[in-house]
């Protein structure tokens, strides 16, 4: 066997492993939040970015083995941004045989008309886009709307709300739309962005750049994203542990008196969630909760951790 053949075999092996991990992550999220049910018609919002391409492929893959029957329809919103390559997505979707609809709405023109030059257009653009997608879901008879946000997006939103909004609020894997008519799901909620990046690169999706509108980037979100990536590099497992924390909320040990009845605590009350451990030196596990090393990752050094040592 030639060296090139060996390299190709290894690349295919790694790609298969990566696809299985993404399938497992998506399958677990679907099961945990009951995202997809028998007979669902899922409207997959396809932006042309790595996340939505990956979401569509994994959902199509799961469709073959899922215990329930569901259908998919891909939807792209052509907002008439200058330079938008409108032929790319139809060609790709035709090539893989997926039902799709391209919705053409000149939201770009509306935003440019309403927002002064130099101001961020994202808020108005998002509202317009959301309304069009909700209307399209109704027209297509879709029972669920699938968005391509992943685990890193959810964590970034959590920190954005904590740092700038004063709220302990993230991005839910499943929710009712703000018009009260549609169920929105995020099947990639358990998927790591770096896995999606590697998968999209290997698949060579026809990625459409996301900066065609010329809008300024969300600098606050970019700061949070850079911070989390730095933590992930310096402290392997921290990202997984933080996401696990979002799934293990202890209201009695926070400070929201609307969420927990602190006023009702009196002599003789039951001990809730272990009582007060605040004066004890809290022992933390040597290996971060929820972290599992992949073949291409090294295990973190097993030094003892305590609250004071976490930076």
From Swiss-Prot:
Binds 1 [4Fe-4S] cluster per subunit. The cluster is chelated by three Cys residues, the fourth Fe has a free coordination site that may bind a sulfur atom transferred from the persulfide of IscS. It comes from the Bacteria. Signal peptide: none annotated. Pathway: tRNA modification. A motif (PP-loop motif) lies at residues 47-52. It holds the Pfam family ATP_bind_3. Transmembrane segments: none annotated. Belongs to the TtcA family. This is tRNA-cytidine(32) 2-sulfurtransferase. It comes from Pectobacterium carotovorum subsp. carotovorum (strain PC1).
């Amino acid at each position: 066997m030639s060296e090139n053949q060996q390299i190709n075999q290894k690349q295919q092996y790694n790609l298969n492993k990566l696809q299985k991990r993404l399938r497992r992550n998506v399958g677990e999220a679907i099961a945990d939040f009951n995202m997809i049910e028998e007979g669902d018609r899922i409207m997959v919002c396809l932006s042309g970015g790595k996340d939505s391409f990956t979401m569509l492929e994994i959902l199509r893959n799961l469709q073959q083995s899922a215990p329930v029957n569901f259908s998919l329809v891909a939807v792209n919103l052509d907002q008439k941004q200058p330079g938008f390559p409108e032929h790319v997505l139809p060609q790709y979707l035709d090539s893989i045989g997926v039902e799709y609809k391209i919705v053409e709405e000149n939201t770009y023109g509306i935003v440019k008309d309403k927002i002064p030059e130099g101001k961020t257009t994202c808020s108005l653009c998002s509202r317009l886009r959301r309304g069009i997608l909700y209307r399209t879901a109704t027209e297509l008879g879709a029972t669920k709307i699938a968005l391509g946000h992943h685990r890193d997006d959810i964590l970034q939103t959590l920190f954005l709300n904590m740092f700038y909004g004063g709220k302990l609020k993230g991005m839910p894997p499943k929710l009712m739309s703000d018009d009260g008519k549609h169920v929105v799901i995020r099947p990639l909620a358990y998927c790591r962005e770096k896995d999606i990046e590697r998968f999209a690169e290997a698949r060579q999706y026809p990625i459409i750049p996301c900066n065609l509108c010329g809008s300024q980037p969300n600098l606050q979100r970019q700061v949070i994203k850079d911070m989390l990536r730095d933590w992930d590099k310096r402290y392997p497992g921290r990202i997984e542990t933080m996401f696990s924390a979002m799934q293990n909320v202890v209201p009695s040990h926070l400070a929201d008196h609307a969420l927990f009845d602190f006023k009702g605590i009196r002599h003789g009350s039951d001990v809730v969630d272990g009582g007060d451990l605040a004066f004890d030196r809290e022992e933390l596990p040597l290996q971060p909760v929820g972290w599992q090393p992949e073949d291409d990752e090294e295990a973190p050094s097993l030094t003892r951790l305590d609250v004071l040592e976490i930076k």
